[in-house]
């Protein structure tokens, strides 16, 4: 059997691995939920985000004529279960997007080799740079600097660059203008309220409370986009209601308002419902039409093409080194209070 394999953070529109000639398996990979080899007590709302968004994505693909199957996390709890899945389905060929996860890639490579499965690797739309572009920039460097990387990205992508090849407004970064205190009389837009009538919301909560009892947090205040429509709505509402003042109060904090003028788009971007290219293009287009201040536009763009891509690069070339070292020789666990 030839299959398209999709992971919980690869719910892209469009998805490069999709083909109606292949069965689509959406894998509730344990690395994202409850892995036995690398046990992690993820927050219950992260678990909920994955389970609900996978179900929505599967339903939509089925409506579009794809043959989609969800492989429940209970079927793959240990690394050897990968092999059982591929064997039981007589998989001979796999099309998959770069998981950008060392453990997942290692497990896939192992089973591909052992079972002699032909694999087709696709760069992920979840980042702007390809895997090769990241390697070309980071591999031969001994030190890494965000500022240098960010300026290179701006030039390469021709974002906020004038006809002379210089930064629009005269500065590469307006970070110094992103630090205003929140005035007492400032009007904060109300948070988006997502609804979940079309998903199995109640049963998902019961499933999480039953199977993830020891995980941190609760599902009570869950309010994240779980499908493409909700994610696009979140992007549009940020641009219309918060973008204007995002820059000035980017670093502000409030005991009353959780998000202030922030977009809260990271969850949707990190599971593929929005792509960084899409968010950057939308913000640039909106700014052209609505005269968004440069400190808001540049500050927002910097988070995506600067910080997000930069940290992805560090993970790709130094992730294993960082994960397996303990420079400060710490021995104590992180307190539970950090997750409350």
Where are the regions that the model predicts?
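Glycine/tryptophan-enriched, flexible segments
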Residues: 157-300
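Glycine-rich phosphate-binding "P-loop"
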Residues: 65-78, 340
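An acidic- and aromatic-residue-enriched active-site/binding cleft used to recognize and process polar
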Residues: 9, 29, 73-76, 99-101, ...
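N-terminal beta-strand-loop-alpha-helix module at the start
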Residues: 1-71
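Beta-rich, aromatic/charged-enriched effector core domains that present basic-aromatic interfaces
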Residues: 79-224
């Amino acid at each position: 059997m030839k299959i398209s394999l999709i992971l919980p953070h690869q719910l892209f529109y469009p998805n490069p691995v999709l083909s109606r000639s292949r069965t689509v398996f959406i894998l509730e990979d344990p690395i994202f939920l409850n892995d036995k080899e690398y046990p992690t007590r993820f927050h219950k709302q992260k678990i909920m985000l994955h389970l609900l968004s996978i179900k929505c994505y599967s339903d939509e693909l089925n409506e579009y004529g794809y043959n989609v199957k969800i492989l429940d996390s209970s079927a793959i709890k240990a690394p050897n279960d990968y092999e059982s899945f591929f064997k039981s389905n007589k998989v001979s060929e796999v099309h998959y997007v770069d998981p950008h996860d060392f453990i997942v890639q290692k497990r896939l490579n192992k089973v591909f080799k052992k079972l002699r499965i032909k694999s087709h690797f696709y760069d992920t739309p979840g980042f702007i740079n390809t895997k090769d572009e990241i390697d070309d920039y980071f591999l031969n460097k001994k030190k890494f600097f965000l500022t240098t990387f960010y300026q290179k990205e701006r030039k390469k992508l021709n974002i906020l660059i004038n006809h002379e090849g210089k930064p629009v407004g005269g500065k590469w970064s307006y970070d110094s203008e992103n630090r205003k205190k929140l005035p007492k009389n400032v009007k904060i837009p109300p948070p988006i309220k997502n609804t979940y009538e079309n998903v199995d919301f109640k049963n998902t909560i019961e499933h999480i409370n039953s199977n993830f009892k020891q995980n941190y947090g609760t599902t009570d205040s869950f309010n994240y986009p779980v499908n493409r429509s909700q994610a696009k709505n979140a992007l549009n509402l940020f641009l219309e209601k918060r973008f204007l003042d995002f820059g000035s109060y980017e670093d502000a904090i409030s005991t009353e308002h959780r998000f202030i003028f922030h977009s809260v788009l990271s969850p949707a971007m990190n599971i593929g419902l929005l792509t960084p290219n899409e968010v950057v293009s939308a913000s640039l287009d909106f700014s052209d039409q609505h005269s968004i201040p440069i400190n808001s536009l540049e500050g927002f763009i910097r988070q995506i093409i600067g910080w997000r891509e930069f940290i992805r690069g560090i993970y790709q070339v130094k992730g294993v080194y960082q994960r397996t070292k303990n420079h400060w020789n710490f021995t104590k666990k992180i307190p539970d209070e950090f997750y409350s």
